């Protein structure tokens, strides 16, 4: 059913659940699993929820400096979890730009069968990686979109 799954991540609890659901699907269908983070202009501060992805010494930088590292750590954690669960074909993608449009464009370019994402992100101030864009992705995507609560 699914051969190519794209999962949008932002570090929120909904995105973590989406990653878990997508990992189960990828394992069940022996599908390619691609995790993506999309960055846009960072906020003035990094939320506590995202700080857990950073080492203490890294938290001394500005959000402009921290965002790429946060995204990298989110992707690394998701990739490790998927590989630990037995998914063989796992890839990570880090992009910047308009979040919903970038997710949809990558899904189309990668020929994703489904986009899996959390139903809610980190909110308007803190959601610089994914945010609350699931409704935009649903309206723009040509493939199936699964939102996870």
Predicted segments, located by residue:
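A short acidic, glycine-rich active-site loop
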Residues: 55-71
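General small-molecule cofactor/ligand-binding pocket signal
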Residues: 36, 91-95, 146
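Gly/Ser-rich helix-loop-strand patches that form or flank binding pockets
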Residues: 101-149
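Active-site-adjacent beta-strand anchor residues
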Residues: 8, 93, 118
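Small/aliphatic-rich secondary-structure junction motif
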Residues: 3-57, 85, 90
């Amino acid at each position: 059913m699914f051969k190519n799954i794209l999962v949008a991540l932002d570090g929120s609890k909904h995105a973590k659940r989406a990653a878990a659901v997508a990992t189960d699907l990828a394992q069940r269908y022996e599908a390619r699993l691609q995790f993506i983070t999309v960055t846009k202009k960072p906020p003035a501060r990094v939320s506590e929820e995202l700080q857990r992805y950073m080492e203490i010494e890294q938290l001394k930088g500005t959000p402009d400096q921290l965002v790429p590292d946060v995204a990298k750590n989110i992707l690394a954690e998701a990739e490790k979890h998927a590989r630990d669960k037995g998914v063989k074909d796992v890839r990570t993608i880090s992009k910047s730009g308009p979040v919903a449009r970038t997710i949809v464009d990558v899904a189309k370019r990668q020929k994703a069968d489904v986009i899996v994402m959390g139903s809610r992100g980190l909110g308007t101030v803190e959601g610089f990686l994914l945010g609350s864009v699931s409704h935009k992705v649903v309206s723009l995507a040509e493939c199936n979109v699964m939102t996870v609560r």
